[in-house]
Amino acid sequence: MKENLTSLFEKVIKLPTTSGCYKMLNENKKILYIGKAKNLRSRIKSYFLEKKSHKIKILMKNVKSIEVITTNSEYEALLLECNLIKTHKPDYNVKLKDGKGYPMVRITHEKYPRIFKTRKIINDQSEYFGPFTNVKKLDQVLDFINKTFKIRKCKKKSNTPCLYYHMGQCLGVCFKENLEKEYQEELDKAKSILNGNISEILSQIDIKLKLAVQKEDFENAIKLKEIKSSLIEINQIQIVTKTNNLNTDYVYVHPGENVNTIIVLKYRNGKLVERDANFDESICKKNELILQFLIQYYTSINMIVPDKIHIFLKDIDTKNAEKLINEIKNTKTEIIYKETEEILKIMEMAISNAELSLREYENKNNKALESLKIFLEMDKLPKIIEGFDIAHLKGQETVASMVTFKMGIPFKENYKLYKLNSLLKGEIDDVKAIKEVILRRYSEIINKNLELPNLILIDGGKGQLNAAFSILKGLKIENKVKVCSLAKKHETIFLTTNKKGINLPQGHPALRILQNVRDEAHRKANGFNKKRREKITLLYTKINGIGEKTAQKILKSIGTYKDILPLSENEISEKIKVNIRLAKRIKEFAIKENSIKT
Protein backbone atom coordinates (compact mmCIF):
# COMPACT_ATOMS: atom_id res chain seq x y z
CA MET A 1 0.00 0.00 0.00
CA LYS A 2 2.78 2.44 0.95
CA GLU A 3 4.57 1.74 -2.34
CA ASN A 4 1.37 2.42 -4.25
CA LEU A 5 0.76 5.72 -2.38
CA THR A 6 4.38 6.76 -2.94
CA SER A 7 4.15 6.20 -6.70
CA LEU A 8 0.78 7.97 -6.78
CA PHE A 9 2.19 10.93 -4.85
CA GLU A 10 5.03 11.23 -7.36
CA LYS A 11 2.41 11.65 -10.09
CA VAL A 12 0.33 14.05 -7.98
CA ILE A 13 3.18 16.54 -7.50
CA LYS A 14 3.38 16.81 -11.30
CA LEU A 15 -0.31 17.68 -11.71
CA PRO A 16 -1.37 21.12 -12.99
CA THR A 17 -2.29 23.90 -10.55
CA THR A 18 -5.38 24.83 -12.56
CA SER A 19 -9.01 24.22 -11.60
CA GLY A 20 -10.69 20.95 -12.50
CA CYS A 21 -12.15 17.65 -11.32
CA TYR A 22 -10.41 14.52 -10.09
CA LYS A 23 -11.53 10.89 -10.02
CA MET A 24 -10.09 8.36 -7.58
CA LEU A 25 -10.23 4.79 -8.95
CA ASN A 26 -9.60 1.31 -7.54
CA GLU A 27 -7.70 -1.55 -9.18
CA ASN A 28 -10.76 -2.43 -11.32
CA LYS A 29 -10.94 1.16 -12.59
CA LYS A 30 -14.12 1.72 -10.59
CA ILE A 31 -14.60 5.35 -9.54
CA LEU A 32 -14.60 5.58 -5.74
CA TYR A 33 -14.70 9.35 -5.31
CA ILE A 34 -15.14 12.46 -7.45
CA GLY A 35 -14.04 15.91 -6.31
CA LYS A 36 -13.42 19.39 -7.68
CA ALA A 37 -10.62 21.82 -6.94
CA LYS A 38 -9.53 25.38 -7.55
CA ASN A 39 -5.96 24.02 -7.58
CA LEU A 40 -5.83 20.33 -8.55
CA ARG A 41 -2.29 19.66 -7.36
CA SER A 42 -2.80 21.32 -3.98
CA ARG A 43 -6.17 19.65 -3.32
CA ILE A 44 -5.10 16.12 -4.24
CA LYS A 45 -1.82 16.50 -2.31
CA SER A 46 -3.87 17.13 0.84
CA TYR A 47 -5.08 13.50 0.80
CA PHE A 48 -1.46 12.38 1.23
CA LEU A 49 -0.19 15.04 3.66
CA GLU A 50 -3.00 15.95 6.05
CA LYS A 51 -4.12 14.01 9.09
CA LYS A 52 -6.82 11.82 7.65
CA SER A 53 -10.14 10.62 9.08
CA HIS A 54 -10.76 6.87 9.25
CA LYS A 55 -12.98 7.00 6.14
CA ILE A 56 -10.32 8.82 4.09
CA LYS A 57 -7.66 6.32 5.24
CA ILE A 58 -9.86 3.49 3.96
CA LEU A 59 -10.50 5.36 0.70
CA MET A 60 -6.78 5.95 0.10
CA LYS A 61 -6.06 2.30 0.86
CA ASN A 62 -8.26 1.35 -2.11
CA VAL A 63 -7.16 4.10 -4.52
CA LYS A 64 -4.86 2.73 -7.23
CA SER A 65 -5.03 5.59 -9.74
CA ILE A 66 -6.18 9.20 -10.01
CA GLU A 67 -7.52 10.85 -13.17
CA VAL A 68 -7.97 14.60 -13.59
CA ILE A 69 -9.97 16.80 -15.96
CA THR A 70 -8.87 20.43 -16.13
CA THR A 71 -11.39 23.26 -16.61
CA ASN A 72 -11.20 26.95 -17.48
CA SER A 73 -12.77 28.08 -14.21
CA GLU A 74 -13.81 26.91 -10.76
CA TYR A 75 -17.46 27.23 -11.81
CA GLU A 76 -16.89 24.87 -14.76
CA ALA A 77 -15.26 22.43 -12.32
CA LEU A 78 -18.32 22.60 -10.04
CA LEU A 79 -20.69 21.98 -12.97
CA LEU A 80 -18.57 19.06 -14.17
CA GLU A 81 -18.38 17.58 -10.64
CA CYS A 82 -22.18 17.79 -10.34
CA ASN A 83 -22.68 15.94 -13.65
CA LEU A 84 -20.01 13.31 -12.93
CA ILE A 85 -21.45 12.50 -9.48
CA LYS A 86 -24.97 12.17 -10.92
CA THR A 87 -23.66 9.88 -13.70
CA HIS A 88 -21.32 7.61 -11.72
CA LYS A 89 -22.80 7.78 -8.16
CA PRO A 90 -19.46 6.97 -6.44
CA ASP A 91 -19.62 5.15 -3.10
CA TYR A 92 -17.64 7.81 -1.20
CA ASN A 93 -19.59 10.86 -2.43
CA VAL A 94 -22.72 12.36 -0.91
CA LYS A 95 -25.77 10.11 -1.22
CA LEU A 96 -28.81 11.53 0.53
CA LYS A 97 -31.23 9.48 2.57
CA ASP A 98 -34.40 11.28 3.41
CA GLY A 99 -35.61 11.52 6.97
CA LYS A 100 -39.35 11.36 7.48
CA GLY A 101 -39.62 14.77 9.17
CA TYR A 102 -42.34 15.98 11.53
CA PRO A 103 -45.93 16.34 10.29
CA MET A 104 -47.64 19.63 9.47
CA VAL A 105 -51.26 20.66 9.07
CA ARG A 106 -52.38 21.45 5.52
CA ILE A 107 -55.41 23.55 4.58
CA THR A 108 -56.08 22.84 0.92
CA HIS A 109 -56.65 25.52 -1.74
CA GLU A 110 -60.17 24.42 -2.77
CA LYS A 111 -63.68 25.91 -2.87
CA TYR A 112 -64.37 24.16 0.44
CA PRO A 113 -60.88 23.58 1.93
CA ARG A 114 -60.05 20.42 3.85
CA ILE A 115 -57.75 20.25 6.91
CA PHE A 116 -55.47 17.26 7.46
CA LYS A 117 -52.03 16.11 8.58
CA THR A 118 -49.20 15.82 6.02
CA ARG A 119 -45.42 15.44 5.82
CA LYS A 120 -45.10 16.90 2.32
CA ILE A 121 -45.36 20.48 1.05
CA ILE A 122 -47.12 20.90 -2.32
CA ASN A 123 -46.78 24.23 -4.11
CA ASP A 124 -50.49 24.71 -4.91
CA GLN A 125 -51.35 27.71 -2.66
CA SER A 126 -52.33 25.45 0.24
CA GLU A 127 -51.67 26.84 3.74
CA TYR A 128 -49.36 25.00 6.15
CA PHE A 129 -49.01 25.07 9.94
CA GLY A 130 -46.31 23.39 11.99
CA PRO A 131 -44.22 21.25 12.09
CA PHE A 132 -45.52 19.44 15.19
CA THR A 133 -43.23 17.17 17.21
CA ASN A 134 -45.98 15.45 19.23
CA VAL A 135 -48.05 13.54 16.66
CA LYS A 136 -50.49 12.16 19.25
CA LYS A 137 -51.42 15.65 20.50
CA LEU A 138 -51.69 16.95 16.92
CA ASP A 139 -54.13 14.12 16.10
CA GLN A 140 -56.24 15.06 19.15
CA VAL A 141 -56.36 18.73 18.09
CA LEU A 142 -57.24 17.88 14.46
CA ASP A 143 -59.98 15.51 15.63
CA PHE A 144 -61.33 18.29 17.89
CA ILE A 145 -61.19 20.89 15.07
CA ASN A 146 -62.93 18.60 12.56
CA LYS A 147 -65.70 17.67 15.00
CA THR A 148 -66.21 21.18 16.40
CA PHE A 149 -66.10 23.25 13.21
CA LYS A 150 -67.78 20.88 10.74
CA ILE A 151 -64.87 20.90 8.28
CA ARG A 152 -65.32 18.93 5.05
CA LYS A 153 -63.70 15.45 5.01
CA CYS A 154 -64.88 14.09 1.64
CA LYS A 155 -62.67 14.64 -1.41
CA LYS A 156 -65.40 14.37 -4.06
CA LYS A 157 -68.83 15.89 -4.53
CA SER A 158 -71.83 13.60 -4.02
CA ASN A 159 -75.59 13.59 -4.54
CA THR A 160 -76.25 12.18 -1.08
CA PRO A 161 -75.15 13.31 2.40
CA CYS A 162 -72.11 11.62 3.93
CA LEU A 163 -71.85 9.86 7.31
CA TYR A 164 -70.22 12.94 8.91
CA TYR A 165 -73.27 15.06 7.94
CA HIS A 166 -75.59 12.61 9.72
CA MET A 167 -73.30 12.75 12.78
CA GLY A 168 -73.49 16.57 12.83
CA GLN A 169 -69.77 16.94 12.00
CA CYS A 170 -70.16 18.39 8.47
CA LEU A 171 -72.21 21.19 6.86
CA GLY A 172 -72.97 18.97 3.85
CA VAL A 173 -70.88 20.82 1.28
CA CYS A 174 -70.37 17.50 -0.52
CA PHE A 175 -74.00 17.61 -1.75
CA LYS A 176 -75.39 21.11 -0.92
CA GLU A 177 -74.82 24.34 -2.86
CA ASN A 178 -74.11 27.97 -1.83
CA LEU A 179 -72.56 27.31 1.59
CA GLU A 180 -69.37 29.32 0.96
CA LYS A 181 -70.06 32.06 3.55
CA GLU A 182 -71.15 29.69 6.30
CA TYR A 183 -68.26 27.31 5.59
CA GLN A 184 -65.71 30.18 5.58
CA GLU A 185 -66.86 31.18 9.09
CA GLU A 186 -66.21 27.64 10.35
CA LEU A 187 -62.85 27.53 8.55
CA ASP A 188 -61.77 30.90 10.02
CA LYS A 189 -62.42 29.58 13.54
CA ALA A 190 -60.26 26.51 12.81
CA LYS A 191 -57.48 28.68 11.32
CA SER A 192 -57.61 30.96 14.35
CA ILE A 193 -56.78 28.00 16.61
CA LEU A 194 -53.94 26.86 14.34
CA ASN A 195 -52.61 30.43 14.39
CA GLY A 196 -52.41 30.28 18.19
CA ASN A 197 -55.59 32.17 19.15
CA ILE A 198 -56.79 29.62 21.69
CA SER A 199 -57.87 31.67 24.74
CA GLU A 200 -61.57 31.73 23.73
CA ILE A 201 -61.72 28.01 22.94
CA LEU A 202 -59.85 27.17 26.18
CA SER A 203 -62.48 29.13 28.16
CA GLN A 204 -65.24 27.11 26.45
CA ILE A 205 -63.41 23.85 27.25
CA ASP A 206 -63.02 24.92 30.91
CA ILE A 207 -66.80 25.46 31.18
CA LYS A 208 -67.49 22.02 29.62
CA LEU A 209 -64.87 20.47 31.90
CA LYS A 210 -66.54 21.83 35.07
CA LEU A 211 -69.94 20.58 33.90
CA ALA A 212 -68.52 17.12 33.14
CA VAL A 213 -66.97 16.90 36.64
CA GLN A 214 -70.23 18.07 38.27
CA LYS A 215 -72.13 15.34 36.38
CA GLU A 216 -69.39 12.83 37.31
CA ASP A 217 -68.84 12.22 33.59
CA PHE A 218 -65.16 11.55 34.25
CA GLU A 219 -64.49 9.89 30.89
CA ASN A 220 -65.55 13.05 29.04
CA ALA A 221 -63.66 15.21 31.57
CA ILE A 222 -60.43 13.30 30.86
CA LYS A 223 -60.92 13.78 27.08
CA LEU A 224 -61.53 17.52 27.52
CA LYS A 225 -58.45 17.83 29.74
CA GLU A 226 -56.33 16.04 27.08
CA ILE A 227 -57.68 18.34 24.32
CA LYS A 228 -56.86 21.40 26.44
CA SER A 229 -53.32 20.12 27.06
CA SER A 230 -52.86 19.37 23.33
CA LEU A 231 -54.09 22.83 22.27
CA ILE A 232 -51.67 24.52 24.67
CA GLU A 233 -48.74 22.37 23.49
CA ILE A 234 -49.24 22.81 19.75
CA ASN A 235 -49.71 26.56 20.30
CA GLN A 236 -46.25 26.66 21.92
CA ILE A 237 -44.72 24.76 18.98
CA GLN A 238 -45.60 27.45 16.41
CA ILE A 239 -42.24 29.27 16.12
CA VAL A 240 -42.17 32.50 14.14
CA THR A 241 -38.99 34.25 13.04
CA LYS A 242 -39.01 38.05 13.13
CA THR A 243 -36.15 38.47 10.64
CA ASN A 244 -38.29 38.94 7.51
CA ASN A 245 -41.28 37.62 5.58
CA LEU A 246 -39.21 36.02 2.82
CA ASN A 247 -39.19 32.30 2.09
CA THR A 248 -35.90 31.12 3.61
CA ASP A 249 -34.30 27.71 4.17
CA TYR A 250 -31.76 27.28 6.98
CA VAL A 251 -29.32 24.44 6.28
CA TYR A 252 -27.24 22.93 9.09
CA VAL A 253 -24.67 20.09 8.83
CA HIS A 254 -24.20 17.96 11.95
CA PRO A 255 -21.18 15.65 11.45
CA GLY A 256 -21.30 12.18 13.04
CA GLU A 257 -18.94 9.22 13.35
CA ASN A 258 -20.65 7.11 10.66
CA VAL A 259 -23.52 9.29 9.48
CA ASN A 260 -23.76 13.03 8.85
CA THR A 261 -27.12 14.66 9.53
CA ILE A 262 -28.20 17.58 7.34
CA ILE A 263 -31.17 19.54 8.62
CA VAL A 264 -33.17 21.94 6.47
CA LEU A 265 -35.55 24.23 8.39
CA LYS A 266 -38.02 25.74 5.92
CA TYR A 267 -39.61 29.11 6.71
CA ARG A 268 -42.42 30.39 4.52
CA ASN A 269 -43.66 33.96 5.04
CA GLY A 270 -41.63 34.08 8.23
CA LYS A 271 -43.15 30.93 9.71
CA LEU A 272 -41.47 27.55 10.18
CA VAL A 273 -43.41 25.07 8.05
CA GLU A 274 -41.15 22.03 7.73
CA ARG A 275 -38.10 20.27 9.09
CA ASP A 276 -36.39 18.02 6.54
CA ALA A 277 -33.76 15.61 7.87
CA ASN A 278 -31.25 14.00 5.48
CA PHE A 279 -28.57 11.44 6.28
CA ASP A 280 -25.25 11.06 4.46
CA GLU A 281 -22.39 8.56 4.77
CA SER A 282 -19.84 10.24 2.49
CA ILE A 283 -16.20 11.05 3.33
CA CYS A 284 -16.60 14.72 2.40
CA LYS A 285 -15.32 17.44 4.70
CA LYS A 286 -17.95 19.80 6.12
CA ASN A 287 -17.34 22.53 3.51
CA GLU A 288 -17.45 20.07 0.58
CA LEU A 289 -20.43 18.25 2.06
CA ILE A 290 -22.63 21.33 2.31
CA LEU A 291 -21.81 22.47 -1.24
CA GLN A 292 -22.52 19.00 -2.71
CA PHE A 293 -25.70 18.80 -0.63
CA LEU A 294 -26.98 22.22 -1.73
CA ILE A 295 -26.48 21.37 -5.41
CA GLN A 296 -28.02 17.88 -5.24
CA TYR A 297 -30.90 18.95 -2.98
CA TYR A 298 -31.98 22.16 -4.71
CA THR A 299 -31.50 20.98 -8.32
CA SER A 300 -33.72 17.90 -7.83
CA ILE A 301 -36.87 17.91 -9.97
CA ASN A 302 -39.58 18.43 -7.32
CA MET A 303 -37.66 20.83 -5.07
CA ILE A 304 -39.02 24.35 -4.64
CA VAL A 305 -36.11 26.80 -4.31
CA PRO A 306 -36.70 29.54 -1.67
CA ASP A 307 -35.74 33.24 -1.92
CA LYS A 308 -32.76 32.71 0.38
CA ILE A 309 -30.75 29.71 1.59
CA HIS A 310 -28.95 30.39 4.87
CA ILE A 311 -26.00 28.16 5.80
CA PHE A 312 -24.40 27.98 9.26
CA LEU A 313 -20.81 27.87 7.99
CA LYS A 314 -18.48 30.85 7.65
CA ASP A 315 -15.98 31.57 4.89
CA ILE A 316 -17.39 29.26 2.21
CA ASP A 317 -17.44 30.43 -1.38
CA THR A 318 -21.01 29.61 -2.41
CA LYS A 319 -21.18 31.85 -5.51
CA ASN A 320 -20.71 28.99 -7.99
CA ALA A 321 -23.21 26.74 -6.21
CA GLU A 322 -25.71 29.62 -6.15
CA LYS A 323 -25.14 30.31 -9.86
CA LEU A 324 -25.57 26.63 -10.77
CA ILE A 325 -28.83 26.25 -8.78
CA ASN A 326 -30.26 29.43 -10.34
CA GLU A 327 -29.30 28.35 -13.88
CA ILE A 328 -30.76 24.84 -13.53
CA LYS A 329 -33.95 25.90 -11.69
CA ASN A 330 -34.37 29.33 -13.33
CA THR A 331 -34.55 31.07 -9.92
CA LYS A 332 -32.91 34.03 -8.17
CA THR A 333 -32.05 32.50 -4.81
CA GLU A 334 -29.19 33.74 -2.62
CA ILE A 335 -26.98 31.52 -0.46
CA ILE A 336 -26.02 33.57 2.59
CA TYR A 337 -24.39 33.48 6.02
CA LYS A 338 -25.31 35.97 8.77
CA GLU A 339 -24.99 36.19 12.54
CA THR A 340 -27.93 37.84 14.27
CA GLU A 341 -29.70 37.05 17.54
CA GLU A 342 -32.68 35.56 15.71
CA ILE A 343 -30.50 33.44 13.41
CA LEU A 344 -28.50 32.11 16.38
CA LYS A 345 -31.80 30.98 17.93
CA ILE A 346 -32.68 29.20 14.67
CA MET A 347 -29.22 27.59 14.71
CA GLU A 348 -29.84 26.27 18.25
CA MET A 349 -33.10 24.80 17.01
CA ALA A 350 -31.32 23.28 13.98
CA ILE A 351 -28.71 21.64 16.26
CA SER A 352 -31.36 20.13 18.54
CA ASN A 353 -33.32 18.93 15.47
CA ALA A 354 -30.17 17.33 14.03
CA GLU A 355 -29.42 15.53 17.30
CA LEU A 356 -33.03 14.40 17.57
CA SER A 357 -33.10 13.17 13.95
CA LEU A 358 -29.88 11.21 14.42
CA ARG A 359 -31.21 9.61 17.62
CA GLU A 360 -34.44 8.68 15.81
CA TYR A 361 -32.45 7.23 12.90
CA GLU A 362 -30.22 5.17 15.21
CA ASN A 363 -33.06 4.11 17.55
CA LYS A 364 -35.10 2.94 14.58
CA ASN A 365 -32.24 0.68 13.53
CA ASN A 366 -31.61 -0.52 17.11
CA LYS A 367 -35.24 -1.62 17.49
CA ALA A 368 -35.12 -3.40 14.13
CA LEU A 369 -31.89 -5.19 15.12
CA GLU A 370 -33.39 -6.23 18.49
CA SER A 371 -36.35 -7.66 16.63
CA LEU A 372 -34.05 -9.42 14.13
CA LYS A 373 -32.07 -10.96 16.99
CA ILE A 374 -35.26 -12.56 18.37
CA PHE A 375 -36.54 -13.88 15.01
CA LEU A 376 -33.13 -15.35 14.09
CA GLU A 377 -32.68 -16.94 17.55
CA MET A 378 -29.40 -15.10 18.16
CA ASP A 379 -27.57 -14.65 21.46
CA LYS A 380 -26.17 -11.24 20.50
CA LEU A 381 -27.44 -8.22 18.61
CA PRO A 382 -26.51 -8.47 14.87
CA LYS A 383 -24.39 -5.30 15.06
CA ILE A 384 -22.25 -6.40 12.10
CA ILE A 385 -23.95 -8.08 9.12
CA GLU A 386 -22.12 -9.28 6.01
CA GLY A 387 -24.27 -9.91 2.93
CA PHE A 388 -23.33 -11.89 -0.21
CA ASP A 389 -24.72 -12.05 -3.74
CA ILE A 390 -23.66 -13.66 -7.04
CA ALA A 391 -24.01 -12.14 -10.53
CA HIS A 392 -23.29 -13.48 -14.04
CA LEU A 393 -24.50 -13.30 -17.64
CA LYS A 394 -25.47 -16.79 -18.82
CA GLY A 395 -22.55 -18.20 -16.87
CA GLN A 396 -20.09 -15.58 -18.17
CA GLU A 397 -18.02 -13.32 -15.91
CA THR A 398 -19.41 -14.74 -12.64
CA VAL A 399 -18.64 -12.41 -9.75
CA ALA A 400 -19.61 -12.04 -6.09
CA SER A 401 -20.07 -9.10 -3.79
CA MET A 402 -19.82 -8.74 -0.04
CA VAL A 403 -21.34 -5.76 1.75
CA THR A 404 -21.09 -4.87 5.43
CA PHE A 405 -23.71 -3.16 7.58
CA LYS A 406 -22.86 -1.83 11.05
CA MET A 407 -25.85 -1.12 13.32
CA GLY A 408 -28.09 -1.34 10.27
CA ILE A 409 -26.08 1.27 8.31
CA PRO A 410 -23.89 0.48 5.24
CA PHE A 411 -20.19 0.38 6.18
CA LYS A 412 -18.76 0.88 2.69
CA GLU A 413 -15.12 0.83 3.78
CA ASN A 414 -15.49 -2.93 4.24
CA TYR A 415 -17.18 -3.82 0.92
CA LYS A 416 -15.45 -6.45 -1.23
CA LEU A 417 -15.81 -7.72 -4.81
CA TYR A 418 -14.67 -11.15 -6.02
CA LYS A 419 -13.92 -12.60 -9.46
CA LEU A 420 -14.88 -16.26 -9.10
CA ASN A 421 -12.63 -18.99 -10.51
CA SER A 422 -14.28 -22.28 -9.50
CA LEU A 423 -16.95 -22.31 -12.23
CA LEU A 424 -16.34 -23.67 -15.72
CA LYS A 425 -17.06 -21.52 -18.79
CA GLY A 426 -20.82 -21.10 -19.16
CA GLU A 427 -21.51 -22.95 -15.90
CA ILE A 428 -24.36 -21.53 -13.82
CA ASP A 429 -24.09 -22.83 -10.27
CA ASP A 430 -24.93 -20.40 -7.45
CA VAL A 431 -24.24 -23.08 -4.82
CA LYS A 432 -20.66 -23.59 -6.04
CA ALA A 433 -20.21 -19.81 -6.35
CA ILE A 434 -21.42 -19.23 -2.77
CA LYS A 435 -19.05 -21.92 -1.51
CA GLU A 436 -16.09 -20.22 -3.18
CA VAL A 437 -16.80 -16.70 -1.93
CA ILE A 438 -17.60 -17.84 1.64
CA LEU A 439 -14.41 -19.92 1.74
CA ARG A 440 -12.29 -17.01 0.45
CA ARG A 441 -13.84 -14.44 2.78
CA TYR A 442 -13.72 -16.40 6.03
CA SER A 443 -10.37 -18.07 5.36
CA GLU A 444 -9.02 -14.52 5.09
CA ILE A 445 -10.68 -13.55 8.39
CA ILE A 446 -9.20 -16.58 10.17
CA ASN A 447 -5.72 -16.16 8.66
CA LYS A 448 -5.55 -12.43 9.44
CA ASN A 449 -7.27 -12.79 12.82
CA LEU A 450 -9.98 -10.28 11.85
CA GLU A 451 -13.33 -9.74 13.56
CA LEU A 452 -16.15 -12.07 12.52
CA PRO A 453 -19.58 -10.57 11.76
CA ASN A 454 -22.53 -11.41 14.00
CA LEU A 455 -24.66 -12.42 11.02
CA ILE A 456 -24.04 -13.61 7.45
CA LEU A 457 -26.85 -13.07 4.94
CA ILE A 458 -26.96 -15.06 1.70
CA ASP A 459 -29.17 -14.00 -1.20
CA GLY A 460 -31.08 -17.17 -2.08
CA GLY A 461 -32.90 -20.16 -0.64
CA LYS A 462 -32.07 -23.35 1.27
CA GLY A 463 -29.49 -24.57 -1.25
CA GLN A 464 -27.37 -21.43 -1.01
CA LEU A 465 -27.78 -21.36 2.79
CA ASN A 466 -26.63 -24.97 3.19
CA ALA A 467 -23.67 -24.33 0.88
CA ALA A 468 -22.51 -21.41 3.03
CA PHE A 469 -23.07 -23.33 6.27
CA SER A 470 -21.05 -26.33 5.01
CA ILE A 471 -18.04 -24.04 4.40
CA LEU A 472 -18.37 -22.40 7.84
CA LYS A 473 -18.54 -25.89 9.35
CA GLY A 474 -15.39 -26.91 7.48
CA LEU A 475 -13.64 -23.82 8.86
CA LYS A 476 -14.96 -24.71 12.36
CA ILE A 477 -16.66 -21.35 12.88
CA GLU A 478 -20.30 -22.44 12.41
CA ASN A 479 -20.99 -21.79 16.14
CA LYS A 480 -19.28 -18.39 16.13
CA VAL A 481 -21.45 -16.68 13.52
CA LYS A 482 -25.13 -16.94 12.57
CA VAL A 483 -26.01 -17.49 8.91
CA CYS A 484 -29.36 -17.05 7.17
CA SER A 485 -30.66 -16.61 3.63
CA LEU A 486 -33.39 -14.44 2.13
CA ALA A 487 -35.33 -15.86 -0.83
CA LYS A 488 -36.73 -13.24 -3.23
CA LYS A 489 -39.99 -14.97 -4.22
CA HIS A 490 -41.87 -14.62 -0.91
CA GLU A 491 -39.10 -12.83 1.06
CA THR A 492 -38.76 -15.99 3.17
CA ILE A 493 -35.94 -16.07 5.74
CA PHE A 494 -34.26 -19.48 6.00
CA LEU A 495 -32.18 -20.69 8.97
CA THR A 496 -30.26 -23.94 9.36
CA THR A 497 -32.35 -24.55 12.51
CA ASN A 498 -35.72 -23.82 10.87
CA LYS A 499 -36.66 -25.91 7.81
CA LYS A 500 -39.98 -24.17 7.11
CA GLY A 501 -38.58 -20.65 6.97
CA ILE A 502 -39.84 -17.40 8.51
CA ASN A 503 -42.21 -15.02 6.74
CA LEU A 504 -42.39 -11.58 8.31
CA PRO A 505 -45.04 -9.04 7.23
CA GLN A 506 -43.97 -6.68 4.43
CA GLY A 507 -42.58 -3.49 5.93
CA HIS A 508 -41.51 -5.18 9.19
CA PRO A 509 -38.38 -3.36 10.48
CA ALA A 510 -36.42 -6.62 10.91
CA LEU A 511 -37.22 -7.74 7.36
CA ARG A 512 -36.37 -4.29 6.03
CA ILE A 513 -32.83 -4.52 7.51
CA LEU A 514 -32.26 -7.85 5.70
CA GLN A 515 -33.77 -6.49 2.47
CA ASN A 516 -31.47 -3.46 2.62
CA VAL A 517 -28.41 -5.71 3.03
CA ARG A 518 -29.59 -8.09 0.27
CA ASP A 519 -30.43 -5.25 -2.15
CA GLU A 520 -27.09 -3.52 -1.54
CA ALA A 521 -25.18 -6.78 -2.17
CA HIS A 522 -27.27 -7.31 -5.31
CA ARG A 523 -26.53 -3.78 -6.54
CA LYS A 524 -22.79 -4.18 -5.98
CA ALA A 525 -22.59 -7.63 -7.63
CA ASN A 526 -24.60 -6.54 -10.68
CA GLY A 527 -22.59 -3.34 -10.99
CA PHE A 528 -19.31 -5.27 -10.88
CA ASN A 529 -20.54 -7.83 -13.41
CA LYS A 530 -21.75 -5.06 -15.73
CA LYS A 531 -18.40 -3.26 -15.54
CA ARG A 532 -16.55 -6.52 -16.31
CA ARG A 533 -18.78 -7.11 -19.34
CA GLU A 534 -18.43 -3.51 -20.53
CA LYS A 535 -14.64 -3.81 -20.27
CA ILE A 536 -14.62 -6.95 -22.45
CA THR A 537 -17.13 -5.47 -24.91
CA LEU A 538 -14.99 -2.34 -25.24
CA LEU A 539 -11.96 -4.55 -25.93
CA TYR A 540 -13.77 -6.31 -28.80
CA THR A 541 -14.77 -3.00 -30.44
CA LYS A 542 -11.05 -2.42 -31.13
CA ILE A 543 -11.28 -5.16 -33.78
CA ASN A 544 -11.74 -3.63 -37.23
CA GLY A 545 -15.36 -4.14 -38.35
CA ILE A 546 -16.74 -4.91 -34.86
CA GLY A 547 -19.36 -2.56 -33.42
CA GLU A 548 -20.93 -2.61 -29.95
CA LYS A 549 -23.74 -5.02 -30.91
CA THR A 550 -21.37 -7.61 -32.40
CA ALA A 551 -19.01 -7.17 -29.43
CA GLN A 552 -21.90 -7.96 -27.05
CA LYS A 553 -22.79 -10.98 -29.22
CA ILE A 554 -19.21 -12.31 -28.93
CA LEU A 555 -19.32 -11.95 -25.14
CA LYS A 556 -22.75 -13.58 -24.90
CA SER A 557 -22.14 -16.46 -27.33
CA ILE A 558 -18.44 -17.18 -26.74
CA GLY A 559 -17.06 -15.27 -23.75
CA THR A 560 -13.59 -13.80 -23.18
CA TYR A 561 -10.60 -13.88 -25.55
CA LYS A 562 -9.46 -17.06 -23.75
CA ASP A 563 -12.72 -18.75 -24.80
CA ILE A 564 -12.09 -17.72 -28.43
CA LEU A 565 -8.60 -19.34 -28.56
CA PRO A 566 -9.64 -23.03 -28.90
CA LEU A 567 -12.27 -22.25 -31.57
CA SER A 568 -11.70 -22.47 -35.32
CA GLU A 569 -12.59 -19.56 -37.59
CA ASN A 570 -15.59 -21.53 -38.89
CA GLU A 571 -16.84 -22.14 -35.34
CA ILE A 572 -16.50 -18.43 -34.50
CA SER A 573 -18.36 -17.53 -37.71
CA GLU A 574 -21.16 -19.96 -36.92
CA LYS A 575 -21.57 -18.97 -33.26
CA ILE A 576 -21.88 -15.20 -33.80
CA LYS A 577 -23.18 -15.23 -37.40
CA VAL A 578 -20.37 -13.24 -39.05
CA ASN A 579 -18.40 -13.84 -42.26
CA ILE A 580 -15.11 -15.81 -42.28
CA ARG A 581 -12.95 -12.70 -42.80
CA LEU A 582 -14.33 -11.11 -39.64
CA ALA A 583 -14.06 -14.42 -37.76
CA LYS A 584 -10.39 -14.55 -38.78
CA ARG A 585 -9.78 -11.05 -37.37
CA ILE A 586 -11.49 -12.05 -34.10
CA LYS A 587 -9.27 -15.14 -33.83
CA GLU A 588 -6.12 -13.10 -34.55
CA PHE A 589 -7.15 -10.54 -31.91
CA ALA A 590 -7.61 -13.29 -29.29
CA ILE A 591 -4.15 -14.75 -30.08
CA LYS A 592 -2.58 -11.27 -29.82
CA GLU A 593 -4.32 -10.51 -26.48
CA ASN A 594 -3.21 -13.85 -25.09
CA SER A 595 0.43 -13.22 -26.07
CA ILE A 596 0.35 -9.76 -24.40
CA LYS A 597 -1.09 -11.07 -21.14
CA THR A 598 1.03 -14.23 -20.77
Curated annotation (Swiss-Prot):
The keyword Iron-sulfur does not apply. Its main location: cytoplasm. It is found in: Cytoplasm. It holds the Pfam family UvrC_RNaseH_dom. Keywords: Cytoplasm, DNA damage, DNA excision, DNA repair, Excision nuclease, SOS response. GO terms for cellular component: cytoplasm; excinuclease repair complex. Residues 17-94 form the GIY-YIG domain. HAMAP family: UvrC. Belongs to the UvrC family. Interacts with UvrB in an incision complex. The UvrABC repair system catalyzes the recognition and processing of DNA lesions. UvrC both incises the 5' and 3' sides of the lesion. The N-terminal half is responsible for the 3' incision and the C-terminal half is responsible for the 5' incision. This is UvrABC system protein C. It comes from Borreliella afzelii (strain PKo). The gene is uvrC.
